[in-house]
Regions:
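Shared catalytic-loop signature of beta/alpha-barrel
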Residues: 1-110, 114-117
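Extended hydrophobic packing segments that form well-structured cores
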Residues: 119-147
Length: 147
């Protein structure tokens, strides 16, 4: 029941309720909610608050779009129990950086967020038209529309 190795979980959990069970049982040291799975910014903030009360850190999982990634970045900047965030924009399709103008690139493990309104992204309509949506399958077998 006890280990010196930190336990992290939560990539595939939905909403604050399963996270609450983990927190109540003191079953993890690090929670990894995913903004696309766990219910968006508001739900991630609630999960973070619940975890903070029990001295559990947050390391958000991120496999969604650049919009989801930057929303998580803004949240991480504002939660005291933030530890680290999964960031793999270098693996995104290169056109994402043209479509989502202002998406931050990491340097030495850090990103600098824009102080522009909203998420700080501008969508380039001309670039979007060059990449019409197509259907793809996600890890859970569901269909996604992506560009």
């Amino acid at each position: 029941k006890h280990t010196n190795i930190s336990i992290a979980t939560g990539e595939r959990l939905y909403s604050k309720f399963p996270f609450g069970e983990i927190i109540d049982k003191n079953a993890a040291d690090v929670l990894q909610p995913d903004i696309a799975n766990a219910g968006g910014l508001t739900e991630l903030k609630k999960i973070s608050n619940m975890a903070e009360a029990k001295h559990i850190t947050i390391a958000p999982h991120n496999t969604c779009s650049p919009v989801g990634a930057i929303a998580e970045m803004h949240l991480c900047k504002n939660i005291p129990n933030f530890e680290i965030m999964e960031y793999h924009a270098e693996f995104y399709s290169p056109h994402y950086f043209k479509v989502f103008e202002g998406f931050p690139r990491q340097k030495d493990g850090y990103v600098t967020l824009s102080d522009k309104p909203g998420l700080g992204l501008d969508m380039n309509e001309t670039e979007i038209k060059k990449h019409p949506p197509f259907e793809s399958t996600n890890a859970r077998g569901g269909a996604n529309k992506t560009i």
